Amino acid sequence: VDGFEVETLAKDPAVREAWLLALAEELRTKSYRPSPVRRVYIWKDQAKTKRRALGIPTVKDRVVQGAAAIVLQPIWEADFHDHSYAYRPKRRTHQAMDKVKEALLSGKVEVVDADLSSYFDLIPHRQLLRQVAKRVSDGSVLRLIKGWLRAPIVEEDRDSGRRKVTPNRCGTPQGGVISPLLANLYLTDLDHAVNDRCEQKPTMVRYADDLLILAKPGQGAGLQTRLKRWLEARELKLNEEKTRLVNTRQEAFEFLGFVVTWRQGLRSKRWYPHVEPSAKS
């Protein structure tokens, strides 16, 4: 948006040091203000049929967001649930799949394979900031986060080449350095509600906005209904066309680029959940 490139800082240490000192002074004097976010599009699939909107902050905003994330991540780590695996230190998809297998082996063979509609784009600012304020009391930090969330979006018209500026009333832009952390935070209450406070004792495994609820036979439909209500109360939407209830004993399902099926051991004759990369991955 401002035409400043990170390569400018990389080339010249003296320029970089002066730039960082000036930025530190802006933060100290509280004169720093977030800049508009540049909207770009990338293809979501190899067939190039669907596009995903990204919001790219300026270099200055990325640096400040990165510094804030370094400070805030350990604070919120204390609240994040053990079954949440995305954007966290020393966690990856294979650990999430191990938790899925563990739940299946415990008899939770009915799966709510949930799809959230445009999750990053729909996160309501007011409710998210309320969640942030539970742990962060520093008004300056709260104002920074509010400013990043509400930064206008700049998009170049592909036909005319003219810039269009629109206000950002909800969502946290995919492409922002702090966005994954905020997106994780907003679903933390759901992690605890399903895993710790639900009388059916299901297991929910979440990787950002990809999630599964694994339950005993006969419990999945009710849990899917409750999930929909929980999301609606927080101004989020369940994509009902893509969300499905799976009896894993009868059909396979995909999660995080893996296909899960039940197989029988050749020697032991015992059934076990088999995980392998999907064709799409």
List PLM regions with ranges:
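Duplex nucleic acid-engaging cores and interfaces of nucleic-acid transaction enzymes
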Residues: G55-A69, T93, M97, K101
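Heme-based O2/NO sensor domains and their adjacent alpha-helical segments
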Residues: E17-K44
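Conserved phosphate-binding loops in nucleotide/dinucleotide-binding enzymes
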Residues: R51-T58, K269-Y272
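Non-catalytic, polymerase-adjacent accessory regions of viral genome-replication enzymes
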Residues: V1-E17
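Basic, alpha-helical interaction scaffolds
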Residues: Q264-S281
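Charged boundary/loop elements
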Residues: V1-G3, I70-A86
